[in-house]
Amino acid sequence: MGSRSVRCFLAAAVMTVGLSLGAGPAPAADTVADCQAMMASGKYAECLAATTKAIEEKSYGEEWPILKAQSEQALGKYPEALATIVAGIERYAWSARLRHLEYESALANGKKEQAAAALMEVEKQVATASWRYTDADDLAAIGWVAIALGADAKAVQEGFFERARKNYSNRPDGFLAAGRLALDKGDVAFAAELLTPAAKEFETNAEIQFLLSEAISSADREQSAQLLQKTLELNPHHVGAMQRVAERQIDLEDYSGAEETIRQMLSVNPHLPEAHALQTVIHQLSNKADAAAQSRAAALKYSVVNPKVDHLIGRKLSQKYRFAEAAAAQRSALELDPEFNPARVQLAQDLLRLGQEAEGWQLAELAHDKDGYDTTLFNLLQLKDSLGRFTTLTSPHFQVRMEKQEAAVYGHRVLALLEDSWTELTPRYEFLPELPVMVEIYPRADDFAVRTFGIPDVSGFLGVCFGKVITANSPASRRDHPTSWESVLWHEFCHVITLQKTGNKIPRWLSEGISVFEERRADVRWGQHMNHDFRDRILGDKITPIGQLSSAFLTAKSGEDMNFAYYESSMVVEHIVSVHGLPALKAVLNDLSTGIQINDALDRHTGGLEALETSFRSFLKEQAKGWAAGVDFSKEAFAEAKPTDLESVKLFLETHPANFPALMTQASLLLQENRQEEAEAALKKLVEQVPGDASTNGPRRLLADVYRKRRETEQEAAILTEHLARTADDLEAAMRLQDLCIEAKQLERVIEQGQTIFGIDPFQIAAIQKTLAAAETLKQNEVAVAQLSTLLELQSDDAPRLHYRIARIQQEIDSIQSRRHVLRALEQAPRFREAHALLLELKRAETATEPAE
């Protein structure tokens, strides 16, 4: 529908608000209502029987053929549904809803010409008799027709669906249409905003409950799951809800559960394209090419030109990181329908994740030209603008894109670390990844989220690897929660190895487990380690079965749950390597690359999954028992006792002498009462009992506070050194230790701590200045110049003096560089006397070294 037609309809609709003119007497509302209730509750066969009888008895009203056709479609009787609609149109030629249904049904039957004709007929009807179509359901139907004809989605949202909502607030039609369109365009915030009150108003409407579940699925998983359950209670055969259940089961690698859900879907509609498409996905993930082809053919049985089938297949494959196969599926969808924009959007994202940027961005721009409302496309193109301000660093094996200032500050160290990871890991796993490995580091968390997930406001991820492409959050985006960015990049490059080596056919738990395992091998301070929470879970028999580890990442309800999933996965890998050797692990990866399933690969190389499960549980429990043996970490008894002061804590400890929460509380209370010696003794004992505790609020950090208050700097430095040997993330402790090293005149250690701090937060100006001072004193000129160069980026207002200091250091080392920097100083501060004097010195030295004629 062209913009003129939209405007004409809207103008007419404004004039006729409140009118609802039909072409005859209304049908018996209670009878129609009964059939509508049957459809809404999933009683499709009963609805079909009732509507068939009503039509045979010549009952009047467009609702009868509409409901009959909808029930036939729900049961997979696609040709019959189209015949019902055509017959209905013969009697109700004015019905825009029947024409819209004809469009959908014709597409479901592969009749594109008939579908196009139905759209044109609606457009003609609206243009000539717009006064007829002002009811909520008509507005919704005509709005969808307008979308199909290429109308601007925002204009449709405002001109049709919003009008249906506002003029008929007691009807669900406008809310359903507006919510569905918002979700189709990725506008989940708007969808949630309008559907939240609608779900309360229409609490028995299964479709509204389902759409709200979809809208909040990222923001509130628990509430979304409850709404999904409510949907299925209202309609046990709700296609969208059952599809979402099956998709979730696929995400969790519960393929048998997904197949059971698919069987339930097919028991209602044996020809449901979505069900067969999801079965195709499972077959492809299981390396069953012939079965996948058969399922795809079944999905396309009635419409071989349906692009939604391949689009769904590709979307799920993409979510499983099978980007090459996913892209191929989207290309197939576009071959069937070159104008199917959702496939173009998904293909653009898949190509970007494959590192095929030129075509990926071209497709994104083309898709945006076709649909300016799609928020995913808007976010992607905003991201492209941000990337245009990045610079590219290269090394033999990597191409790193960073914001320009960040690249100047720590880009050199990024490249060095990545090359170190290549040198260490490629021979270890006997695999050379495709070159170049592309790394993108984002200073804005939303840019990282859009590049990685297609949407902003996704938190909790430090980095992601797609196979050839790594995306990571810059330390600048994590300054409130600092972590070692070096460990993140090492972790992600390990994913490059495991994903590419297996053709992205590796289960998430194994890929994550290997990455964390290799983090710990590279640096004992990196990766997840045993802690009291993990210990309690393990000894409390909450070990996740190996076969369910991948799902543990998706079902985690807290950061602790997620960290435990990483830890468990890494310990499975450690156990495999310690018992069966690294060659067994590599053999599993090789098997996965050929399409062998993980359980079969483990059977072949680790003695079988059942035996591995048993030995792993024993191994992990031994690790837990050996960590802080004899210490009681339980919180329940201490919480029940509710001690309020030091004496009551001591009283509790008389019967619970090894209770860690009580011992820590005792130490804290002793500190509050300034009983330093007693606090020191208590904390020393805790350090001995729990030597592996590297938490920022653990006994070592509290003991360091004791020494700091007593100004016992040597002891404070010693305990902080112990602490920082176990963690690479405690920025505050690292900065304090650097200060202590300055006080002790341990300048080498000042520089060492400066490097540690740089590996957490390279933008700490105070730490850089302290490292610089130590380097200058020790005449470590290379280190000093590096610190000054960093300060040039972070303190541009002091650039003349910084250039001068670099020139002074390099005067005896590299006169050319010295001259360049002194000239830069004078360029920015022409009256800089010291710089003029240095330039003269350089000139005299240059003249003195020139050969005589």
Where are these regions (language model features)?
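Start-of-helix register in tetratricopeptide repeats
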Residues: A29, E63, R97, D135-L139, ...
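Structural signature of tandem alpha-helical TPR/SEL1-like repeats
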Residues: G42-E46, L75-T84, G110-A118, L149-F160, ...
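Canonical positions in the second alpha-helix
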Residues: K53-A54, A87-G88, V122, R163-A164, ...
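Beta/coil-rich, acidic/histidine-enriched accessory regions frequently appended to metallopeptidases
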Residues: D30-T31, Q36, L211, S332, ...
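Structural marker of alpha-solenoid helical repeat scaffolds
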Residues: E57, R91-Y92, Q125-A129, K166-N167, ...
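Juxtacatalytic substrate-recognition/specificity segment
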Residues: D30, A83, Q114-E121, Q125, ...
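Canonical tetratricopeptide repeat
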Residues: L67, L101, A141, A177, ...
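Residue-level recognition of tetratricopeptide repeat
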Residues: Q36, Q70, E104, W144-A146, ...
